[in-house]
Each structure stands twice: as C-alpha cells, then as structure tokens.
C-alpha cells in the first residue's frame, strides 16, 4: 500500500513498521522506518529514496530536497505505545509534539527558549503533569484557556499559553 501526504509525497510500504509525519504547518515531511522496507516518492519531480530500518528521510518542502540519516527510531514511534520520548529536543519542538499528542493548541510566547533542550521519557503522564515537570527545569509558567463554543455549536481546542520568565 502507499500513503499520500498533503505536500505530494507518496510513501510506498512493504510489510513494515514506520511513521510518517506530514503536517501542513511544518517545513519538513519526515518518514522513519523501524522495520521492513519503504520507498518515498515525489511524483511531481520523479524523485524517490529507499529507507532501511533505523533510517529517517526528511523532505524539505522549501528547498525541495531529501535528507537521509540514521535515527533513534524509538523516539519517533513511541507514541504508538503511549510513550513520548524526547532526546536532545528543543523546548519549541517539545511543545509542538505535546500539542499534537494531547490535541490542544500550545502557544509558546518566548521563542528565546529555543536554546533549551531536553531528554525525557513520559509514559502515562497528563499534559499538565508534563508541563509541571518542565516548569521545574526551566523558569516557565503556563495557563489554560478553556474551549470556546462557536456559533455553529462546535468548540475550539483547549489553549495552553506558555511563558518563560
């Protein structure tokens, strides 16, 4: 079978364990292979790359280039087992992943915090427990804004505002 991403990348899958991360708001499409075999194809340009287990392929949507590297697969696929693993991860990237994992909008007001990196593994902690742990490592405070009901009866996502001080 194959997976089509919004940016036009097609990932052909052959009896594998893999992860594709393809968010519209991100500059990269990431494919990580745990086992088996995948081919990543960009139909518009006729370009393809093949991955071996333990490899990651990033497609830079701006430069239109593939970049292949070795990767700690467990960090990229642990979410499937209910774990979040961060290895040398910036605070900004960590908050993006937490936002996706917990389906909340996290607004990080102080981009100067990109200099902070973390190494952590979370198994069953709630978002608020994780934010409490982070605030013990970094001078950080956070506030939660409840969802707002829209005119059509639906609700916005819960919003979490993170500030460094």
Q: How would you describe each model-predicted region?
A:
Residues 64-165:
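N-terminal export/assembly leaders
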Residues 1-63:
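Short, small/hydrophobic-biased targeting/export segments
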């Amino acid at each position: 079978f194959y997976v089509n991403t919004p940016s036009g990348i097609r990932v052909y899958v052959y009896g594998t364990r893999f992860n594709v991360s393809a968010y519209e708001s991100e500059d990269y499409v990431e494919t990580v292979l745990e086992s088996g075999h995948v081919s990543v194809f960009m139909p518009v340009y006729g370009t393809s790359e093949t991955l071996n287990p333990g490899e990651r392929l990033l497609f830079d949507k701006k430069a239109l280039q593939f970049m292949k590297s070795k990767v700690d697969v467990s960090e990229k696929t642990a979410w499937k087992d209910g774990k979040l693993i961060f290895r040398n991860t910036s605070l900004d990237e960590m908050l993006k992943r937490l936002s996706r994992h917990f389906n909340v909008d996290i607004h990080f007001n102080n981009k100067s915090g990109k200099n902070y990196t973390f190494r952590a593994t979370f198994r069953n902690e709630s978002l608020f427990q994780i934010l409490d742990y982070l605030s013990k490592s970094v001078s950080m405070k956070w506030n939660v804004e409840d969802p707002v009901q829209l005119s059509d009866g639906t609700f916005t996502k819960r919003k979490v505002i993170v500030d460094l001080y």
